[in-house]
Amino acid sequence: IERANQIAQTTELSANLAKGVKLIDARNKTDFAAGFIPGSINIQGNNAFATWAGWFLTYEEPFMIVASENQIEDLTRKLMRIGLDKVVGFVDNVTEWAAATGQQLETGKVISMDDLNELKQQNNLQLVDLRGAAEYNAGHIKGAEHVFVGTIEKNLDKVSKDRRVVILCQGGDRAAIAYSVLAKHGYHN
């Protein structure tokens, strides 16, 4: 873990990404949507961080984390408590990485309920509800497909690549995770 407490240099990050090392972006969903490294998964560094990381990481695979320097110790501790200790480094500035490599950051769009109501008027729209089964069964938007966020990678076949897709949950955190997973798998609709 001593090695993991170091901020990765641009070349180290690029080399790890080329080797397939997963990149977990722990920034808040708004900062993530404004610009993120392609292929990264947004799991916000809040109280649910370790829970969601446990759904998307295995105990064997190395990974890196995008986070501010003051979050590193806390996030590392949370992950170690559930056995995820293969952190190989941290990244604190995605903009510097993009500038140094010449690569473009991807962006996402956060929409409001008003935006959603407007989009629902379109025929070419798929709604994907990411909440748990009990939440979904207690009430959901008519026509929304249920795909629990923790299983989104195993259920990509349920998400259209041809239609416009709106993913939703209760507060947006799970939608940010699912958005990043979908973007990683080539969904840009």
What are these regions (language model features)?
Residues 1-2, 29-126, 130-189:
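Rhodanese-like catalytic fold shared by cysteine-dependent sulfurtransferases
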Residues 1-19, 24, 28-32:
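C-terminal accessory/connector segments of nucleic-acid motor ATPases
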